[in-house]
């Protein structure tokens, strides 16, 4: 499927609205995420590789906050356990509709892929079934901080022994100099990918009230308190990282 280039913030806006995952964003999302998140393609593909090491027969693999289904597609490319099913969940109607279109296109190109169910739902209200792999790929940061512990606890309870949670997030840093350096480098990354100063500033204004990053130590402590036994960072590029949490 084709997608449009991200020009959502290219023109001056009289009032910058809070960022929402609507049809406008869904239409440009592949371009937006690739140009905004350093290492994103590597993270997505390796979630599939990692999942293949943890997926178990007769369980479900969850992609929570699936957006257009990039992680779901990676899971289906790499996992071949018997009687596994991918459950892809997002609360955005626009994202879910396009996700289904992308997965239909994937089905037409490959044979014997894992079955997938795409749900338009709030992951905070989702009833988890027995799972061997859960992916939260840049999703937790959009959930209210006070609601994050309960969600992680419910995910931990749903994971079978030998399963795993993969958590990818933008990070904040306790050290002010480290925070400033990595913020500046991230802005440089976006400039190098063709975003103007206006686009960078307006996108930052739109997203700062809806995305609340945590530090790596906050993530680690929260996961341990939720019942996970081990937290292993496996990827970091600038201020973006991905962790494996083991039950």
UniProtKB/Swiss-Prot annotation:
SUPFAM superfamilies per UniProt: S-adenosyl-L-methionine-dependent methyltransferases
Keyword check for Cell membrane: no
GO molecular function, one term: carboxyl- or carbamoyltransferase activity
GO terms for biological process, alphabetical: tRNA wobble uridine modification
InterPro entries associated with the record: CmoA (IPR005271), Methyltransf_25 (IPR041698), SAM-dependent_MTases_sf (IPR029063)
Name of the top EC class for this enzyme: transferase
One Pfam family recorded for the sequence: Methyltransf_25
Catalysed reaction equations from the record: prephenate + S-adenosyl-L-methionine = carboxy-S-adenosyl-L-methionine + 3-phenylpyruvate + H2O
Signal peptide: none
Chain sites annotated for binding S-adenosyl-L-methionine: 40, 65-67, 90-91, 122-123, 137, 204
Keyword S-adenosyl-L-methionine: yes
EC number, UniProt record: 2.1.3.-
Residue ranges that the Swiss-Prot or TrEMBL entry lists as coiled coil: none
Keywords recorded for this protein, A-Z: S-adenosyl-L-methionine, Transferase
UniProt subunit comment: Homodimer.
Homology family: Belongs to the class I-like SAM-binding methyltransferase superfamily. Cx-SAM synthase family.
Free-text function comment from the UniProt entry: Catalyzes the conversion of S-adenosyl-L-methionine (SAM) to carboxy-S-adenosyl-L-methionine (Cx-SAM).
Stated name of the protein: Carboxy-S-adenosyl-L-methionine synthase
Originating organism: Stutzerimonas stutzeri (strain A1501)
């Amino acid at each position: 499927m084709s997608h449009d280039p991200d020009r959502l913030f290219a023109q001056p806006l009289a009032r910058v609205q809070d960022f929402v995952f609507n049809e406008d964003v869904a239409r440009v999302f592949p371009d937006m995420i690739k140009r905004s998140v350093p290492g994103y393609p590597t993270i997505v593909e390796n979630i599939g590789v990692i999942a293949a090491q943890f997926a178990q027969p007769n369980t479900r693999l969850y992609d929570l906050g699936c957006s257009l289904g990039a992680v779901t597609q990676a899971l289906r490319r790499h996992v071949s356990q018997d009687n596994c099913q991918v459950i892809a969940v997002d609360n955005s109607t626009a994202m879910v509709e396009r996700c289904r279109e992308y997965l239909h296109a994937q089905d037409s190109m490959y044979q014997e892929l894992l079955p997938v169910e795409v749900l338009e739902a709030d992951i905070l209200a989702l009833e988890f079934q027995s799972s061997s792999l859960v992916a939260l790929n840049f999703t937790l940061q959009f959930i209210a901080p006070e609601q994050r512990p309960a969600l992680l606890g419910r995910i931990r309870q749903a994971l079978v022994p030998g399963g795993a949670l993969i958590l990818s997030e933008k990070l904040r840093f306790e050290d002010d100099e480290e925070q400033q350096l990595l913020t500046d480098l991230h802005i440089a990354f976006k400039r190098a990918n063709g975003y103007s100063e206006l686009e960078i500033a307006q996108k930052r204004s739109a997203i700062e009230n809806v995305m609340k990053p945590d530090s790596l130590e906050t993530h680690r402590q929260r996961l341990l308190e939720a019942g996970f036994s081990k937290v292993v960072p496996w990827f970091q590029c600038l201020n973006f990282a991905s962790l494996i949490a083991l039950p």
